[in-house]
């Protein structure tokens, strides 16, 4: 989060970089009568529309039609600042983390000490399903592929909340390292790989047992992770070293690839061929690039120019397009993956951070 996360993490790392991971209608937080789980089936035979979402730290969620790259809806959040966002694997639910906003006269640290929420909406109706209380300063939210759980990192509590995806109730928490932030979950839904920004480690969490089973050292200030669909290779952005760590999960050997300045989020294509790293830089010296890394050769094959403060990143399921939030420009860059060129810049509301596609 631009004004919160890194300034808290500086107590651990002395890092000065700031990481911050108009629609046709505006929705508030009015709950539906029934709270469907992400597993419930819909009797809908119409062709599905693809969307991508941005979590805007100024206080909103932008919903963008992927066929037109136009904002079609905006959800306002008066109670806090959305940080990261994800669509469920079945495409029916969108969830995001919501950290409390500072009140007048409140210190930044005081805001950090307030519990936050995980908020869930129906994708097709834009109706609120449930707002779930989690820990202090929630960072990222990820659904398991099997549809059973939703995990949320709580950066001030040094733990991960586990939410039942059917009932939207918190069922437990796993203790991890210091300052947990971004993470991804293995395709088999067994393990979460959590970047601990206050350390130099990735926590491996056994999801079924709510337990950290291993820590992997990767370097100074890891921000988030990605994992190949075969579960063999883990990647982590190492912000304090301007590198992408690539970890062989059979041997836990770590290799590093130099990327741009201040790497934030990373996303791996569904075919595992390339990984894309959004390089944010700092607010004083923002970066504006995406590094495209060949996962076989472990080399950067191209660097793509985006807007200022490239932060969140996602690739469409067909691997044709890459979407990047530019936190200091208030935009999303749409990149043609075949040409490595930006083909569209979409204006959203202030400080877009996380991004997800359905």
Where do the protein language model's features map onto the residues?
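N-terminal secretory signal peptides that target proteins for export/translocation
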Residues: 1-3
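Predominantly soluble domains enriched in secretory-pathway, periplasmic, or organellar proteins
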Residues: 7-10, 18-358
């Amino acid at each position: 989060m631009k004004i919160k996360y890194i300034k808290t993490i500086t107590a651990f790392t002395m890092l000065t970089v700031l990481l911050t991971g108009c629609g046709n209608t505006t929705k508030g937080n009015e709950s539906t009568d029934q709270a469907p789980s992400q597993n419930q089936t819909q009797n809908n035979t119409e062709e599905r529309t693809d969307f991508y979402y941005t979590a805007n730290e100024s206080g909103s969620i932008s919903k963008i039609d992927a066929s037109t790259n136009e904002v079609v809806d905006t959800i306002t959040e008066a109670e806090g600042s959305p940080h990261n966002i994800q669509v469920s694997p079945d495409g029916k639910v969108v969830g995001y983390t919501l950290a409390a906003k500072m009140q007048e006269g409140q210190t930044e640290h005081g805001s950090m000490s307030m519990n936050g929420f995980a908020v869930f909406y129906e994708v097709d109706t834009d109706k609120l399903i449930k707002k779930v209380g989690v820990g202090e300063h929630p960072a990222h939210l990820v659904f398991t592929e099997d549809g059973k759980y939703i995990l949320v990192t709580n950066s001030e509590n040094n733990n991960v909340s586990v939410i039942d995806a059917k009932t939207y109730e918190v069922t437990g928490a796993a203790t991890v390292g210091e300052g947990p932030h971004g993470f991804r979950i293995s395709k088999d839904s067994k393990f979460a790989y959590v970047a601990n920004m206050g350390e130099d480690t990735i926590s491996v969490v056994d999801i079924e047992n709510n337990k950290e089973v291993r820590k992997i050292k990767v370097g100074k200030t890891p921000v988030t992770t990605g994992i190949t669909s075969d579960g063999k290779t883990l990647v982590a952005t190492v912000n304090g070293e301007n590198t992408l760590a690539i970890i062989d999960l059979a041997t836990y050997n770590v290799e590093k690839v130099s990327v741009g300045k201040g790497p934030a989020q990373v996303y791996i294509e569904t075919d595992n061929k390339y990984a894309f790293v959004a390089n944010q830089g700092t607010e004083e010296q923002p970066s504006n690039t995406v590094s495209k890394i060949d996962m076989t050769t472990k080399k950067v094959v191209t660097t793509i120019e985006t807007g200022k403060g490239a932060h969140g990143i996602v690739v469409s399921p067909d691997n044709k397009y890459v979407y990047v939030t530019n936190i200091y420009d208030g935009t999303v860059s749409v990149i043609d993956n075949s040409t490595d060129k930006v083909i569209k810049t979409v204006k959203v509301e202030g400080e877009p951070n996380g991004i997800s596609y359905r």
